[in-house]
């Protein structure tokens, strides 16, 4: 079976989609966003296709497309959509699969189920994206604790933003996990610049093995 990698984050708006695009491009993978909330601006799937350089057929259609830009549980209620979390199964594809969640681990899909509940059922290796700015130590260590409490395999932490060596070091030490690399902020964000930045900061094979 090809590698299946879940990309999640400590919070929303930290650059998780940009990282997912870089990872999918580096692995020549297929990308899937199960639930998209908000359709007026560019969707995450659209951004990943634009930034990854992948062909359109490598971007799988979302299982749910919700018009309202809100947490999926609320967006679904406003839009009159019932999200069947039991039907959210990882697609079977012939190459690596990068799956992106929404916001953080505890974002609700319904009034009863959060993303981390689905991740635990999938039991696929997970990459935790974390910002490097003030407050990241607490948010990231809490996220790692939640992941470990559910026996989800954690590949490591991908840091996003400006260099903050002490915060990055204390997170991997106290979290007993790997620092996969750090994707810096890019003045010019396009497919070529993102590909170069990812290649300089990450080793693709770190994402293809079993979680340590």
Curated annotation (Swiss-Prot):
Positions bound to substrate: 37
Keyword line: ATP-binding, Biotin biosynthesis, Cytoplasm, Ligase, Magnesium, Metal-binding, Nucleotide-binding
Catalytic activity: (7R,8S)-7,8-diammoniononanoate + CO2 + ATP = (4R,5S)-dethiobiotin + ADP + phosphate + 3 H(+)
Pathway assigned in UniProt: Cofactor biosynthesis; biotin biosynthesis; biotin from 7,8-diaminononanoate: step 1/2
Family annotation (InterPro entries): DTB_synth_BioD, P-loop_NTPase
Enzyme class: ligase
Record has Calcium as a keyword: no
Family: Belongs to the dethiobiotin synthetase family.
Function: Catalyzes a mechanistically unusual reaction, the ATP-dependent insertion of CO2 between the N7 and N8 nitrogen atoms of 7,8-diaminopelargonic acid (DAPA, also called 7,8-diammoniononanoate) to form a ureido ring.
Protein name: ATP-dependent dethiobiotin synthetase BioD
Gene name for this UniProt entry: bioD
